[in-house]
UniProtKB/Swiss-Prot annotation:
GO terms for molecular function: NADH dehydrogenase (ubiquinone) activity; ubiquinone binding. NCBIfam families: NDH_I_M (TIGR01972). The chain crosses the membrane at residues 4-24, 35-55, 87-107, 113-130, 134-154, 167-187, 208-228, 242-262, 274-294, 305-325, 330-350, 386-406, 411-431, 462-482. It is found in: Plastid, Chloroplast thylakoid membrane. One of its GO terms (biological process) is electron transport coupled proton transport. It is a multi-pass membrane protein. Its EC number is 7.1.1.-. This is NAD(P)H-quinone oxidoreductase chain 4, chloroplastic. It comes from Nicotiana sylvestris.
Length: 500
C-alpha cells in the first residue's frame, strides 16, 4: 500500500492554487493566464507521474487508496481511490482542462474569477472520478456544477441567463434524485449508515428497492449524459457558453454522467441494470437517430455540434446496456474519444466565430480560401466525428457494434434491428457533419467580404488543435493504449451479472 496521499494532492491542488489567484499582484491578465496554465500543467504532470509509477494496470482492485475519518457523527470518510475505470477520465480531464485554459486566452473581463472557476471545476471533476465514498461523490458532483453556472452567467452570449437558469434547474433537479439514492443506499439494512463503495458493491437489495434506487440514480446521470428526453439544456448551454467552457462541458462534464452509470448503476445495482438494459438499448438507438436528424435541422453552428454530441452519447449508452465486455470497453473508449473530438469541434467553432462574428450556418460560406488552416483542422475533426477509419471514433463505434452482436442477453432479431438502426445513425452522421463543413467553408458568400478580420489560425490555436488531434489519431491506430487500462475492471463488473 502506498501511504503518500497522491490523490488528495491531485484533487485539492487546483482549487487551493486557484484561490491564490486573488492575491496575485495587479499586473494585467498575462500573469493570471500564465499562472493558471502553469498550475494545470503541473497538475497534469503530477497525475501522470502518480499513475505511471504507482498504478498497476493489470490489477482490477482499487489502488492508491486513501481513507481518512472526516465526520464521526455520520461515518463520513474522505475516501479516494482509482481503478481502470477512472484513470482514463481523470487523465482526459487534466488534458482537456489544460488546453481549455489555453483556449481562454482572449478572456479579459474578470479574468481572476474566470480562471479560478475553471480550476475549481477541475478539482470537482477529478474528485468525482476518484471518490470511493457515496456522499463524497455527491459533494464533488455538486462542487463542479457551481463554477459551470457562474461561467455561463458571466461569460456567455446574449441569452446566457436563460441558458444558465435552464442548466441549473435540470442539473439541480437531477442532483435531488442523486442525493436520495445516495442516502437510500447508505441507510438501507444496517444500524450504522455505510457510504463506502466497497461495502455497497457487496450488498444485496430486494428487487423492488433496487429498481427504485436504480431509477433515482439513472435520472441524475441521464440529465448529465444527457439521455433523451432530458437533453434540452445542452444545446442552449453550448449555444451561449464561451468556447473554453464548451470544451469542458463537451469533453468532461457529459462523460461524468456515463461514468456514473457504469460506476453506480452497473457496479452497485446489477440486478436492476440487467432488467433495464433492453430499455436502455432502445433509448440509445432512438437517441442516435433522433439527435442526428435534429442536428441536421440546426442553423446555429454550436447547437449542431451539441446535438452531434447527444447522438454520439447514444453509442455509449448502447455499449453500457450490451452487458458484454466488448460493448462496455467500446463505451469506455467512446467516452475518451468523444471527449477529445467534442472539445476540439467547439474550440474551432468558437475561434471561427471570433473572426467572422456569424453564428448561423446559412449566413456563412467561402472561408476556406482566406482561412486554410482553420479549414484543414475543422475538416479533420469532422472526419473524426463521423468515425473515419484510422481515428478514435471508428474503433470505439466498431467495438460497440461487436459488443451487441456477440452479446448473449439479446435474441437474434432484436440484435439485427438494433445494429440496423445504429447503421442508419452512422450514415446520418456524415450527412450533418459534411453539410456543416460545406456551409461554412465552400461557396462565395463571405469570399468577397472585407478581409480585415479574416486572419487564419495563430500559433496558439494551431498548437491546441494539433495537441487534441494527436491522441485522436493515436487511439485510432493503437486503441489498446486506452483499452488495456480498464479490461480487467470491466471483467470484474460484468462478473456480477453472471455470478450474483
Amino acid at each position: 500500500m502506498n501511504y503518500f496521499p497522491w490523490l488528495t494532492i491531485i484533487v485539492v491542488f487546483p482549487i487551493f492554487a486557484g484561490s491564490l489567484i486573488f492575491f496575485l499582484p495587479h499586473k494585467g491578465n498575462r500573469v493570471i493566464r500564465w499562472y493558471t496554465i502553469c498550475i494545470c500543467i503541473l497538475e497534469l504532470l503530477l497525475t501522470t507521474y502518480a499513475f505511471c509509477y504507482h498504478f498497476q494496470s493489470d490489477d482490477p482492485l482499487i489502488q492508491l487508496v486513501e481513507d481518512y475519518k472526516w465526520i464521526n457523527f455520520f461515518d463520513f470518510h474522505w475516501r479516494l481511490g482509482i481503478d481502470g475505470l477512472s484513470i482514463g477520465p481523470i487523465l482526459l480531464t487534466g488534458f482537456i482542462t489544460t488546453l481549455a485554459t489555453l483556449a481562454a486566452w482572449p478572456v479579459t473581463r474578470d479574468s481572476r474569477l474566470f480562471h479560478f472557476l475553471m480550476l475549481a471545476m477541475y478539482s470537482g471533476q477529478i474528485g468525482s472520478f476518484s471518490s470511493r465514498d457515496l456522499l463524497l461523490f455527491f459533494i464533488m458532483w455538486e462542487l463542479e456544477l457551481i463554477p459551470v453556472y457562474l461561467l455561463l452567467c458571466m461569460w456567455g452570449g446574449k441569452k446566457r441567463l436563460y441558458s444558465a437558469t435552464k442548466f441549473i434547474l435540470y442539473t439541480a433537479g437531477g442532483s435531488v434524485f442523486l442525493l436520495m439514492g445516495v442516502l437510500g443506499l447508505a441507510l438501507y439494512g444496517s444500524n450504522e449508515p455505510t457510504l463506502n463503495f466497497e461495502t455497497s458493491v457487496n450488498q444485496s437489495y430486494p428487487v423492488v428497492l433496487e429498481i427504485i434506487f436504480y431509477i433515482g440514480f439513472f435520472i441524475a446521470f441521464a440529465v448529465k449524459s444527457p439521455i433523451i428526453p432530458l437533453h434540452t439544456w445542452l444545446p442552449d448551454t453550448h449555444g451561449e457558453a464561451h468556447y473554453s467552457t464548451c470544451m469542458l462541458l463537451a469533453g468532461i462534464l457529459l462523460k461524468m454522467g456515463a461514468y456514473g452509470l457504469i460506476r453506480i448503476n452497473m457496479e452497485l445495482l446489477p440486478h436492476a441494470h440487467s432488467i433495464f438494459s433492453p430499455w436502455l438499448m432502445i433509448i440509445g438507438t432512438i437517441q442516435i437517430i433522433y439527435a442526428a436528424l435534429t442536428s441536421l435541422g440546426q442553423r446555429n453552428l454550436k447547437k449542431r455540434i451539441a446535438y452531434s454530441s447527444v447522438s454520439h452519447m447514444g453509442f455509449i449508452i448502447i455499449g453500457i446496456s450490451s452487458l458484454t465486455d466488448t460493448g462496455l470497453n467500446g463505451a469506455l473508449l467512446q467516452i475518451i474519444s468523444h471527449g477529445f473530438i467534442g472539445a476540439a469541434l467547439f474550440f474551432l467553432a468558437g475561434t471561427t466565430y471570433d473572426r467572422i462574428r456569424l453564428v448561423y450556418l446559412d449566413e456563412m460560406g467561402g472561408i476556406a480560401i482566406p482561412m486554410p488552416k482553420m479549414f484543414t483542422m475543422f475538416s479533420s475533426f469532422s472526419m473524426a466525428s463521423l468515425a473515419l477509419p484510422g481515428m478514435s471514433g471508428f474503433v470505439a463505434e466498431l467495438i460497440v457494434f461487436f459488443g451487441i452482436i456477440t452479446g448473449q442477453k439479446y435474441l437474434l432479431i432484436p440484435k439485427i434491428l438494433i445494429t440496423f438502426v445504429m447503421a442508419i445513425g452512422m450514415i446520418l452522421t456524415p450527412i450533418y457533419s459534411l453539410s456543416m463543413s460545406r456551409q461554412m467553408f465552400y461557396g462565395y458568400k463571405l469570399f468577397n467580404a472585407p478581409k480585415d478580420s479574416f486572419f487564419d489560425s495563430g500559433p496558439r490555436e494551431l498548437f491546441l488543435s494539433i495537441s487534441i488531434f494527436l491522441p485522436v489519431i493515436g487511439i485510432g491506430i493503437y486503441p489498446d493504449f486506452v483499452l488495456s487500462l480498464a479490461v480487467d475492471k470491466v471483467e470484474v463488473i460484468l462478473s456480477n451479472f453472471f455470478y450474483r
